């Protein structure tokens, strides 16, 4: 344990902080996008699950909302099978499932074509 590790927050706290930013509908889009990429960087199933919370809010203007959601979708699909458990967990607890279902479908179709 070095001196800097004392001041670093735990991965759980980092995920929770990024989750709050990614879900902020009235905040700056740059903050949401940076938080999304931070969650992708962390890369754990919990971080991906937190990232999926971006799909639970709507942002004005709707074109910005659509762009951000498309970007999150692409990044989740890139994770492939590593994102499946988080997607399934999200689908079991949330009502807004359009984007996560789309991600899961793309991941599973890609896997099917690779086999």
Enumerate the language-model features and the residues they cover.
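Structural detector for internal amphipathic alpha-helices that build alpha-solenoid repeat scaffolds
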Residues: 1-11, 29-44, 63-82, 89, ...
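Short, charge-rich amphipathic alpha-helical segments embedded
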Residues: 42-60
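Solenoid-like repeat scaffolds
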Residues: 23-27, 56-62, 89-96
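Buried hydrophobic core positions in alpha-solenoid tandem helical repeats
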Residues: 14-19, 50-55, 86-88, 115
């Amino acid at each position: 344990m070095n001196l800097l590790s004392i001041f670093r927050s735990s991965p759980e706290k980092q995920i929770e902080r990024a989750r709050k930013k990614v879900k902020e509908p009235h905040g700056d889009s740059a903050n949401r996008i940076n938080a999304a990429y931070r969650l992708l960087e962390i890369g754990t199933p919990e971080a991906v699950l937190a990232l999926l919370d971006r799909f639970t809010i709507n942002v004005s203007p709707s074109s910005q909302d659509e762009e951000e959601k498309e970007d999150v979708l692409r990044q989740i699909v890139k994770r492939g099978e590593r994102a499946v458990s988080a997607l399934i967990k999200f689908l079991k607890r949330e009502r807004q499932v359009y984007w996560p279902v789309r991600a899961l479908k793309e991941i599973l179709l890609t896997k099917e074509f690779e086999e």
